[in-house]
């Protein structure tokens, strides 16, 4: 696979359980080949993750630019936190590490920020004015804040103290539901409380729900109550991080 016939990048999404990638047409957001997924190595050290990035580059015979997302606060190419990956990523020059491993130019962005940006350009928030929040419900809760089409990076709304003396992603993430065997009714109630909290803080105009659990959005979105904004599933489903 090469990028010679169209404007494209290799999109790679690094997650706690899987690292997936696909070449993406940057004008349409469409995949140019079937996505490829590799299990995240354990421990997910910089060296181990770098080897997977190189494996994806080789799989697609890629020679161009890479856009890579990461489950951490990313600032000026540095990862300032480490969610669901090895702690050695904290304060690491992650963009340089991964670019060196790939042997290609690479741009690094927080995973939820990248998903939100993809929804702004190609998906559910395309043309949306005002404040849009995207949350990704997975191993944790990622977030993106878009104001009049502009991304405000590294919001980390999953780490808000909620409901009491804890953080939101320990209360209503996809992993919490799965690990506890929580029924949809209880999960919906917890998510509803969290969204009401975000409503008080930010008064968003639109809420987009992504992450793996968004595949079953009909189980919980219609039951949400008391919100002054629309809640919609991500158009790009669980591939938004790649796009």
Task: Identify the role of each PLM range.
Residues 70:
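Glycine-rich nucleotide/cofactor/substrate-binding loop typically near the N-terminus or early
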Residues 1-66, 74-78, 96-104, 118-133, ...:
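ATP-binding/phosphotransfer module of carbohydrate and carboxylate kinases, centering on a glycine-rich
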Residues 142:
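Histidine-centered metal-chelating micro-motifs
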Residues 79-91:
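A charged helix-plus-loop insertion that forms the helical arch/lid used to bind
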């Amino acid at each position: 696979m090469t990028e010679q016939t169209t404007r494209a990048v290799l999109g790679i999404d690094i997650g706690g359980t899987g690292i997936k990638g696909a070449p993406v047409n940057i004008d349409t957001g469409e995949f140019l080949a079937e996505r490829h997924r590799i299990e995240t190595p354990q421990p997910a050290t910089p060296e181990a993750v770098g080897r997977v990035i190189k494996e994806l580059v080789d799989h697609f015979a890629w020679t161009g630019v890479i856009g890579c997302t990461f489950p951490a606060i990313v600032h000026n190419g540095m990862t300032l936190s480490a969610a669901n990956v090895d702690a050695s990523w904290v304060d690491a020059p992650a963009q340089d590490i991964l670019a060196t491993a790939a042997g290609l130019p690479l741009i690094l962005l927080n995973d939820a920020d990248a998903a939100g940006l993809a929804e702004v350009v190609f998906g559910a928030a395309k043309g949306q004015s005002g404040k849009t929040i995207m949350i990704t419900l997975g191993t944790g809760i990622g977030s993106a804040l878009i104001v009049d089409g502009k991304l405000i990076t590294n919001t980390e709304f999953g780490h808000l103290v909620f409901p009491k003396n804890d953080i939101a992603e320990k209360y209503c993430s996809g992993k919490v539901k799965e690990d506890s065997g929580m029924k949809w009714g209880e999960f919906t109630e917890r998510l509803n409380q969290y969204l009401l909290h975000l409503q008080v803080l930010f008064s968003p105009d639109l809420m987009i729900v992504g992450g793996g659990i968004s595949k079953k959005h009909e189980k919980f979105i219609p039951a949400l109550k008391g919100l002054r904004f629309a809640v919609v599933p991500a158009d790009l489903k669980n591939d938004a991080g790649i796009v």
